C-alpha cells in the first residue's frame, strides 16, 4: 500500500457482544464504580474493600469523601440539624457559564453549595459543624460559602458552642472574583469574635486544603488536626519552585511535613477522628 493510499474501513466490533460456536451472546457489563484506582499504591481496589471510611486496605491511602459520608462517619446518628440552607448563589460578575455550571453541579451532588453547616453531637458532645465537599466545584470558596460559615460562627457565639470545620478546597472561586476573596477577611473576623467569646474552634484539614481557605480560617483553629497525607498549601508546588528557584522536598505541602514544622497539631486517622474530636471538645468544656 502506498503512503497516501486510502485505507480499507475497519470492522466495528461491539465490545459488549461475543460470538461463540456461531451463537451471538451478550457479554455482561462491569459496573463503572465497582473498582477504584488507589492514587497511593496505584492498585485497583474493590469498592467494598474500602469500607465506609474509604481507606485503601493495601497502603492506607485516605480517599476523598462527600459531606454526607463525612457526617455518617462523624456525628451521632440523627443528631445533625442543618442550618442556613436556601442561600442562593449569585453571579456578580456575569461570568460566562457560571450559573449553568452551578446548576449541573447541584444536580450531580445534591448539594446547594460547597459547604454543609449545622449543629450536631459527636459522641455526645454538642458542636456547631461545617463540612466542605470537594465534589462541589472543588469546594471553592464563594460568597455563599463565606456567608454560611460566618453565620455558623455567629450562631455558635449565641449558643455558646464550639465550632468544628472539616476543610477541603481548591481556593477562592474565580467566577466570583474579588467577592470571593473578601470572604477570607469576613470569616476571619467571625473567628476572632468567636475566640473573644472564649469558645473553642477546631479545624480538620482534609485533602485538598489549599488557596484562600488555607490562608484564612483553615489555619486559624485553636487546634488543627489533619488526615494522613492531606495536601495543604496556598500556592501550587510548581509556582513556589519557579519563585524560589529550588527543588522542594517530595513531601512538601503534605500534612506530615506541616506537622513536623509546627503548622499542624496532630495527624489523625479517619476512623479515629470522631473519638479524638469528642475528647478534645470534652477537655474544653463541651456541651453535653
Language-model segments: residues:
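N-terminal alpha-helical interaction blocks
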Residues: 1-24
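Short, intrinsically disordered, charge-biased short linear motifs at domain edges
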Residues: 22-29, 40-47
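Short Cys/His-rich "knuckle" micro-motifs
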Residues: 47-51, 64-70
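Conserved catalytic cores of soluble enzyme domains
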Residues: 170-288
